[in-house]
Amino acid sequence: MFPDNVKFISTPRFIEGGAGADCFGNFNLALHVGDESNAVSANREFLEKHYKLPSSPKWINQTHSSVCVRVDSKFSSASADASYSRTSGVVCGVLTADCMPVFICDKRGTVVGIAHAGWRGLVGGVIESLIEEIDVEGNELLVHLGPVSYTHLTLPTICRV
């Protein structure tokens, strides 16, 4: 379904070879949740090797917003909830638990993007922001909705006219 040069990965909380405390899962990739930073670093290294990534993922500081940033090989950090790249070999990454990752690429595999889609981001338009930034005709886009932990998902009642 996706171009051969595009790879989307969703990781489990637990994996053989992972490091970290059980309360975070042994394959925690998040530095901001209180897990040991050396365990997270080891898991990030394992992620690159195990999944044969072409480069280290470009992580964003997720803020439950609709902000989308473009990343390339020189990208270091930004506060956003979506990122995209047109640079071959660049890996865009988001962290999710009770939010859903939304993967987007064009049919030719020349642009890839990912959104951290929680209810605040969805209401705020994070997916729309990503699609607008990617700037590809809708009939040329491919979308994959990643897994979400529905047992921890909180959805408030929202009415919008």
Predicted regions located by residue number:
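Active-site microenvironment for binding and transforming phosphate-containing groups
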Residues: 1-155, 160
